[in-house]
Structure formats: structure tokens, C-alpha cells
Amino acid sequence: MLKLRLKRCGRKQRAVYRIVAIDVRSRREGRDLRKVGFYDPIKNQTCLNVPAILYFLEKGAQPTRTVSDILRKAEFFKEKERTLS
């Protein structure tokens, strides 16, 4: 089973996160299948690869609660409805 979850990057006291598609059994810093986005909580910046996220969601990937909150803030689900219509 796949998950869309955050992978910590950056340095001490300056965390930046990549949104990755990863196997459930892998640890947080484990090998990811694909990087599908980027999130900087300090600058409050988000960069999403929408086609890649849609691909993994169609394959059955489940986003974690934090990733789904990030996607909701970026109005990803509204875009998804537009692309499906």
C-alpha cells in the first residue's frame, strides 16, 4: 500500500519537507517512489506536482492527515474536481 507523506529535509531548526509517494512499510527517511511536492512551513510555501499526485491517488495511495491538510489549503481537491469534469 502506498502513502503520500512528508519526508523531512533541511537543517537543524530549519525543517523543509518533501511530499513523497512511499510504501507504508518504509520509514520516514526511507527510499521514496517519487517526489510529488514540496512544503516549507516557515515561509508557508507549497509546490505540488498535480499530475503525479492524481496518478498516485488513482492507484490507491492514501495521503496522511498532514498531507491532506496541505492539499486542502492549496485547493487541490477543487482542481481535481475541475479536471474530472
UniProtKB/Swiss-Prot annotation:
Domain of life: Eukaryota
Annotated GO MF terms: structural constituent of ribosome
Main location: plastid
Pfam families tied to this protein: Ribosomal_S16
One Gene Ontology term from the biological process aspect of the record: translation
Protein keywords: Chloroplast, Plastid, Ribonucleoprotein, Ribosomal protein
Induction line: Transcribed and spliced in green leaves.
Subcellular location per the Swiss-Prot or TrEMBL entry: Plastid, Chloroplast
Cellular-component GO terms for this entry: chloroplast; plastid; small ribosomal subunit
NCBIfam families in the record: S16
Family: Belongs to the bacterial ribosomal protein bS16 family.
Protein name: Small ribosomal subunit protein bS16c
Species, as recorded: Oryza sativa subsp. japonica
Taxonomic lineage: Eukaryota, Viridiplantae, Streptophyta, Embryophyta, Tracheophyta
